[in-house]
């Protein structure tokens, strides 16, 4: 086993498997959240009588399958799942009791708390498991890095022993081996960069260490300038960026998972989704450090001074870690907890006052602007209950705007801070709860009205002035035409008579042909406009026929229908983008690591899929822009659900930004793939170069063989990743099968007809007109020129 540890590649495949399993776990957790959301939606529809119990059973089966997949992934990652329990069995017991009763809102309200409790417990435990898995990955990366720093590799000794042989190897093979070593150590250096980055902002010693880290960078830049080969091509940068593989970040999937997990666990969905979006964005200092370490690894073997600089930087990194451990700033959560504990102790003393009501309610103070009122609330309370309390006591209405934020005052420090779901338990007797309003909204409205009036008056004056100028100019031009003589009329008549009649006929025919084409386009546009007007009128009639009763308002029906449609569109697009990223990731590995060139049809198909996904994102954006004003009008009358729907809309808008970012990164990766393919087509012999292996020392063959056998025995096959790879391979096979089924003629015909590339000839009206002219000409030629 010691020989296996001395292997330089030991631990590197495990790092890659851990990174891939981490992304797979995030994907499976996202699918589990989708199944949970679908089960709750189906239960709501079942209570209203729109669906049957069969669909509820199908949703439960899907949730159970997704739970099993998540459990397998965590168990394969060495995370204990015994404390989670049998969640599908617990859900089954509650659902069986629920489905035996008649579907109604009372039945759902009776059993829904148990179902939500099971789901919330599951999600809380999954969050803990994800945190444990993340810590395990960081500890493993740190241990592997420390092992590489302390123990020299056996393979490197072999390569050093054969120094004379390596001097005859070409530069390209050396560069490829260096890039492979750099790719294996990227994941370790990322964790190292995070440590330095998190500490450099807190202590002065970290700033000095960061200044020391910048010194090797200057030496590395000098080596880069002196050691660059003159025959380096542009595909090196593209290939190195592909080998990094940091473009595909799956921001939309992470934001979706964080939002729904926070929603089901009654946490702040806006902050959770925003935090998920920030987690995938690396800081500039971290990127700078990664680039420095990468360049030092890539070109550090050319100069011994650079090696010493890099080692000094690593030693500084260790000292930075020691500073972060010993620094008192790393223990800042302890005083924060003490600060939070002190107002609770104070509030516990306050709650013993005689003002406390006998029915379990506590007095609090509500404030809006300069008005303050005292009222009693039942603790613990909710944000919606506080909003309704403000509406009841102050007759407040937010109108078409969003409900303002609620602030509470800390009794110990006298500072107002925003009330969140996590801080609802902090509300005690005697707390001041304030509703923050925008300052002087009426002044803004008045300024807007005055601006509009001024613009309207200015535009009216401009229109009147232009009309006067036009009328005055037309009168002057008419007088000039009456006064001026016309001496050239006779000459023009003689010139017109002397022109060639054949040219006139040809010009007339050309004009008729162009008019025929214009008429054809006009007819097509007119038919499209008529069809659009008909659809609009039909929708208006359907809208007029809807009822506006208070109990079953069409606004609520329209809102639910729009939400369902928007959610289905975003979920479908999210799955589509994830599948597209999987395909591009496979192509990236094929091009960057295996040096295999994908087929042109595959590149064209992926390019079309990217364009379609971007078009779907634009459609989703247009849908949101159209529906957002209608949603705001509905929010005026329905205060209870306004915050949830606004958060849902904010999520969709942020998902659009994330999807655009993901598609941009996918498009960037795809462009790099095409660039590498073009360079490989220009230089086909480079990909076929055989690597020159170093000659082993005499008598070391048995040692190498034992090392290989120990490495084979220590292999741990990853069956789940193999199943996932088989699924992805089946998708690729299906795509290739469709590509092989179509030939070039079908593709060209589809593109030619679909893009409306047919030449405009005037349509059937022009053909009919020409036929009539020919018929008349034939009749005149047969019966004589006098025939009509």
UniProtKB/Swiss-Prot annotation:
Region (Disordered), start-end ranges: 140-253, 298-338
Keywords: Coiled coil, Phosphoprotein
Modified residues (Phosphoserine): 233, 327, 342
Modified residues (Phosphothreonine): 12
Keyword DNA-binding (UniProt): no
BP GO terms, sorted: actin filament bundle assembly; astral microtubule organization; bipolar cellular bud site selection; budding cell apical bud growth; cellular hyperosmotic response; establishment of cell polarity; establishment or maintenance of actin cytoskeleton polarity; positive regulation of actin nucleation
Gene Ontology terms for molecular function: actin binding; cytoskeletal regulatory protein binding; enzyme activator activity
Basic and acidic residues bias locations: 305-324
Pfam families: AIP3 (PF03915), Aip3p_Bud6_N (PF23153)
Compositional bias per record (Polar residues), positions renumbered to this chain: 149-162, 187-225
Residue stretches in coiled coil: 573-628
Function, as annotated: Not essential for mitotic growth but is necessary for normal morphogenesis. Involved in the organization and/or function of the actin cytoskeleton.
Protein name: Bud site selection protein 6
Organism encoding this protein: Saccharomyces cerevisiae (strain ATCC 204508 / S288c) (Baker's yeast)
């Amino acid at each position: 086993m010691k020989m296996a540890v001395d292997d330089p590649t030991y631990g590197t495949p495990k790092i890659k498997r851990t990174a891939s399993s981490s992304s797979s776990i995030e994907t499976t957790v996202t699918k589990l959240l989708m199944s949970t959301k679908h089960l709750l939606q189906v239960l709501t529809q079942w209570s209203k009588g729109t669906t049957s119990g069969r669909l509820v059973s199908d949703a439960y089966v899907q949730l159970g399958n997704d739970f099993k997949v998540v459990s397998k992934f965590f168990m394969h990652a060495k995370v204990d799942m015994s404390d989670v329990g049998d969640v599908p069995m617990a859900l089954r017991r509650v659902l069986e009791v629920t489905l035996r009763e008649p579907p109604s809102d009372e039945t759902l309200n009776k059993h829904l708390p148990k179902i939500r409790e099971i789901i919330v417990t599951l999600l809380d435990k999954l969050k803990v498991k994800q945190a444990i898995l993340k810590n395990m990955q960081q500890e493993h990366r740190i241990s592997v890095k420390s092992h590489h720093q302390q123990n020299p590799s056996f393979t490197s000794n072999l390569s050093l022993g054969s120094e004379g042989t390596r001097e005859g190897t070409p530069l390209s093979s050396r560069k490829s081996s260096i890039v492979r070593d750099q790719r294996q150590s990227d994941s370790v250096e990322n964790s190292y960069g995070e440590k330095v980055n998190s500490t450099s902002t807190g202590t002065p010693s970290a700033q000095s260490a960061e200044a020391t880290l910048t010194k090797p960078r200057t030496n590395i830049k000098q080596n880069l300038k002196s050691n660059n080969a003159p025959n380096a091509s542009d595909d090196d940068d593209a290939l190195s960026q592909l080998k990094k593989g940091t473009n595909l970040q799956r921001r939309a999937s992470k934001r979706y998972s964080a939002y729904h997990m926070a929603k089901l666990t009654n946490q702040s969905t806006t902050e959770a989704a925003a935090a998920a979006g920030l987690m995938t964005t690396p800081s500039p200092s971290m990127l700078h450090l990664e680039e420095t370490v990468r360049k030092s690894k890539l070109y550090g073997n050319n100069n011994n001074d650079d090696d010493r600089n890099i080692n000094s930087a690593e030693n500084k990194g260790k000292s930075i870690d020691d500073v972060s451990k010993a620094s008192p700033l790393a223990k800042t959560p302890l005083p924060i907890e003490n600060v939070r504990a002190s107002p609770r102790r104070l509030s516990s003393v306050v709650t013993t006052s005689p003002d406390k009501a006998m029915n379990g309610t506590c007095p609090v103070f509500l404030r809006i602007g300069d008005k303050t009122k005292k009222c009693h609330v039942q603790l613990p309370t909710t944000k919606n209950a506080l909003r309704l309390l403000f509406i009841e006591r102050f007759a407040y209405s937010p109108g078409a705007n969003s409900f303002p934020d609620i602030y509470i005052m800390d009794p110990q420090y006298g500072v107002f801070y925003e009330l969140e779901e996590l801080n609802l338990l902090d509300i005690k007797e005697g707390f001041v709860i304030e509703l923050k309003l925008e300052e002087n909204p009426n002044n803004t409205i008045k300024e807007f009205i005055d601006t509009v009036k001024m613009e309207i008056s200015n535009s009216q004056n401009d229109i009147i002035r232009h009309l006067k100028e036009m009328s005055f100019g037309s009168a002057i031009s008419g007088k000039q035409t009456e006064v001026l003589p016309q001496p050239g009329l006779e000459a023009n008549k003689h010139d017109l008579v002397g022109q060639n009649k054949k040219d006139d006929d040809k010009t007339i025919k050309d004009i008729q042909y162009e008019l025929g084409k214009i008429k054809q386009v006009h007819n097509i546009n007119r038919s499209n406009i008529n069809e659009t007007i008909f659809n609009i009128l039909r929708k208006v009639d359907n809208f007029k026929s809807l009822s506006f009763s208070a109990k079953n308002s069409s606004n609520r029906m329209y809102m639910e229908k729009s939400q369902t449609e928007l959610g289905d569109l975003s979920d479908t697009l999210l799955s589509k983008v994830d599948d597209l990223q999987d395909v591009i990731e496979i192509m990236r590995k094929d091009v960057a690591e295996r040096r295999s060139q994908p087929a042109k049809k595959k590149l064209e198909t992926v390019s079309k899929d990217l364009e379609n996904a971007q078009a779907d994102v634009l459609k989703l954006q247009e849908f949101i822009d159209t529906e957002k004003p209608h949603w705001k009008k509905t929010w005026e009358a329905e205060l209870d659900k306004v915050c949830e729907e606004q958060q849902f809309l904010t999520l969709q808008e942020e998902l659009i930004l994330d999807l655009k970012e993901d598609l941009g990164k996918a498009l960037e990766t795809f462009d790099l793939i095409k660039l590498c393919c073009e360079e490989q087509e220009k230089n086909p012999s480079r990909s076929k170069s055989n690597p020159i292996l170093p000659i082993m020392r005499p008598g070391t063959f048995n040692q190498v063989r034992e090392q290989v056998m120990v490495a084979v025995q220590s292999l741990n096959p990853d069956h789940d990743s193999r199943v996932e790879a088989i699924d992805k391979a089946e998708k690729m096979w299906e795509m290739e099968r469709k590509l092989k089924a179509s030939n070039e003629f079908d593709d060209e015909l589809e593109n030619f007809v679909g893009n409306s590339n047919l030449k405009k000839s005037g349509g059937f009206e022009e053909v009919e007109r020409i036929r009539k002219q020919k018929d008349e000409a034939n009749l005149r030629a047969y019966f004589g020129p006098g025939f009509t």
